[in-house]
Amino acid sequence: DRAYASQLAQLMGILFGPGGAPAGPSPFDRPTAVVSGKWDSVVTLTGPIHDAAQCTEGLVLEYADGMASADVGWGRADGRALTDLLALHELYFDLAQRTFYPAQVQGSNLASHIVDTLEQAALGDPVPGALGPPGERIVVLVGHDTNIANIGGLFGMNWWIPGTQANPMLPGGALVFELWKRAGQTSAFYVRTSYVVQTLDQMREATTLTLANPPARSPIFVPGCSGEGPAFDAPLASFVRVARHVIDPSFIAEDQ
């Protein structure tokens, strides 16, 4: 509570007005509990951590959608405030989705297919579990912010985007795994990982994205395989080795 007291007080000021005190019992006074999850979640957090994250997400969506400043959080939430409040949002994801066990249970299947697809692209021959045919230059998977958080937690990856907190889960964000081959070499494949997303201000202003004015990109260091350099390139063989170590085969479905 102490670590996030200032952000919680700020959120309460936005929700309840000057003084930050509700007319009745505060929804943030009840204890946090860890309960069995539903649908695609192994566990669920209930209580103030969950509620604060949900409230923050609503305010972020108001801002990103271009609502008038007087209407975002009843005129009490600007871009700077939202940057601070994102710490509450990311706290929930860090505990519920990035913690290794739920990340492994929920992310092993997706991670396995990603690795198989990279290996297939390098080999040029079909690999069981790969997505798309050999020779496909790009594969796009549409999912949820929980999928991104699961993969991040599974590999121990972290990223940062200007105007946010660590490991932001922003609308339209994407984890990107690029397969590269160095010029003049026939078999030296490596993986370059990054998180790409529009900044909140780009969303709010409906900025046209171009090569000259791109979305924000955060290169990602993958523990156990990434090397030095600004892009943290990882040899494909090392990336696969790390992936096979953290992926639990019992949660892999070859056809899903």
Regions found by a protein language model. Give the residues of each.
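Signature for phosphate-centric chemistry
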Residues: 1-139, 143-256
